[in-house]
Amino acid sequence: MSAKADIALIGLAVMGQNLVLNMNDKGFVVCAYNRTVEKVNQFLKNEAKGTNVIGATSLQDMVNKLKLPRKIMLLVKAGSAVDDFIQQLVPLLSPGDVIIDGGNSEYQDTARRCDELRAKKILYVGSGVSGGEEGARHGPSLMPGGHPEAWPLIQPIFQSICAKADKEPCCEWVGEGGAGHFVKMVHNGIEYGDMQLICEAYQIMKALGLSQAEMATEFEKWNSEELDSFLIEITRDILNYQDDRGYLLERIRDTAGQKGTGKWTAISALQYGVPVTLIGEAVFSRCLSALKDERVAASKQLKGPNVNAKVEDLPKFLNHIKHALYCSKIVSYAQGFMLMREAAKENNWNLNYGGIALMWRGGCIIRSVFLGNIKDAYTRNPQLSNLLLDDFFKKAIEVGQNSWRQVVANAFLWGIPVPALSTALSFYDGYRTEKLPANLLQAQRDYFGAHTYELLGAEGKFVHTNWTGTGGNVSASTYQA
């Protein structure tokens, strides 16, 4: 059989199948392969019946069916499975062929694979794929990075199958090495933050006595304003959903799962020294939710405030919640972009931040009108150091911050946990504070560990004080704090 496939895809779980069908719809001939060959046969007989998709019975068979330079996309479980397939593929490939990892790989693994395959003259791309099963079928957000020479080879396919926002593709080259998977990781972390903020708004509304129908109406209203987004939209739908037993939401166990990508973002923030506090709290909130049995026991023993959530003007307070959610969302994205900026500096990536915002405008879980405002901010000033300093976002927080403070303060007085809303406000106040109490912290470190400190006006010169008159004058070398 002559080589006629434009691209091969390995891994026929639902995401893989949907991407194959998406590529087929856009006029590309796809060769489908799965480690279990029977899955290929079933796919061709069922979901891919009547399409131009062709199957392969082995990796060699798949390679033989591909046009040169070959393009092979892996959609398999992150980790050793990716390395195993790469190891099997390399002997079958020619210099200049392209391997694309479309799974949720850790960006360090992608960077390592780029280095390893560069030496073997194979081009490698690590691409974030967002949008879930529906996005894969009808248009995902794609975030490719790796060997830049691979981009012209895969660009026609990627920009054809991806989502479009204002007729622009939600896919652009991100950067070298692990840049694509890093940006996807931050996207997932921001997703954690957005979801947690919405959950906190829901919990406050619930405490105020709103019915699910009333909450759904409020989310519907927000979705027609500045909070217009996929997650607000689906929250409305979830609140409205009823089965034969009534509203489903209240019967769902309040223990949240996680696949680890939010945790990776929080860990990266610590490694790069960037205060991505909201995503961190969103991850920890899921961890706390998992302690269901302990929380049930604690609810019977630990006392809180003896007041019920109550406001004089409910519509006005619901508007406060909307502003609090919006201001916190601005902080969350500002923190995410801070993390990407620092990682870009450390890894020599030339990231296009406005382009990244555009990539997230459609096809992905965090898609929202708000991302267009971020794109505009970086168009106005490509060197913008922080989104909070952009005129549009400054004005938005100026308008909403009194509401934000009202909501957080009342939640505290009512004993309602709002870790994401409150940490966002604390970050905002910390970021706008000229002088933080870290001078005392430095003095403490120097007192017990001789870690030294800098004096105002003498930056770069580190000094130590003998605070008790009994210690020495040398700085610490072993005790770190």
From Swiss-Prot:
Subunit architecture: Homodimer.
SUPFAM superfamilies with a match to the protein in the record: 6-phosphogluconate dehydrogenase C-terminal domain-like (SSF48179), NAD(P)-binding Rossmann-fold domains (SSF51735)
Family according to the record: Belongs to the 6-phosphogluconate dehydrogenase family.
NCBIfam families in the record: gnd, PRK09287.1
PANTHER family registered for this protein in UniProt: 6-PHOSPHOGLUCONATE DEHYDROGENASE
Keywords: Gluconate utilization, NADP, Oxidoreductase, Pentose shunt
Protein name in the entry: 6-phosphogluconate dehydrogenase, decarboxylating
Reaction(s) the record says it catalyses: 6-phospho-D-gluconate + NADP(+) = D-ribulose 5-phosphate + CO2 + NADPH
Pathway(s) the chain acts in: Carbohydrate degradation; pentose phosphate pathway; D-ribulose 5-phosphate from D-glucose 6-phosphate (oxidative stage): step 3/3
GO MF term list: NADP binding; phosphogluconate dehydrogenase (decarboxylating) activity
Positions bound to NADP(+): G11, L12, A13, V14, M15, G16, N34, R35, T36, V76, K77, A78, N104
Organism from which the protein derives: Ceratitis capitata
Name of the coding gene: Pgd
UniProt xrefs under InterPro entries: 6-PGluconate_DH-like_C_sf (IPR008927), 6PGD_dom2 (IPR013328), 6PGDH_C (IPR006114), 6PGDH_Gnd/GntZ (IPR006113), 6PGDH_NADP-bd (IPR006115), 6PGdom_BS (IPR006184), NAD(P)-bd_dom_sf (IPR036291), Pgluconate_DH (IPR006183)
Job description of the protein: Catalyzes the oxidative decarboxylation of 6-phosphogluconate to ribulose 5-phosphate and CO(2), with concomitant reduction of NADP to NADPH.
Binding, substrate: N104, S130, G131, G132, H187, N188, Y192, K259, R286, R445, H451
Domain of life: Eukaryota
EC assignment: 1.1.1.44
Pfam family, one: 6PGD
Biological-process GO terms, alphabetical: D-gluconate metabolic process; pentose-phosphate shunt
Catalytic residues (positions): K184 (proton acceptor), E191 (proton donor)
